[in-house]
Amino acid sequence: MKVIDIANRRRIYFEMKQQELRASILMTVAGFIIAFAILVFQISFELGHLYHYIVTFAFLTYLSLHLYSNNKLARKIEKKQQGY
């Protein structure tokens, strides 16, 4: 007879998902830092084309926030953890 520890599996699953959520937040922050560093570096060399970099940075910022706000998995995990 095989005994399956469902509670332990769920706990491990939710811990993995929490780590994935933290990693996605860290990746988003790292993306912002890299984008900002590239922007500063480019502005220092090409002040005449400043609007290209401002538009690009704004687009990347919007895209990052849009992807993060639509992360339904993160919302489900937060709801389930609040229920425990």
UniProtKB/Swiss-Prot annotation:
Keywords: Membrane, Plasmid, Transmembrane, Transmembrane helix. One of its GO terms (cellular component) is membrane. Its main location: membrane. It is found in: Membrane. The chain crosses the membrane at residues 25-45. It is a single-pass membrane protein. This is Uncharacterized protein pXO2-13/BXB0012/GBAA_pXO2_0012. The lineage of its organism: Bacteria, Bacillati, Bacillota, Bacilli, Bacillales.
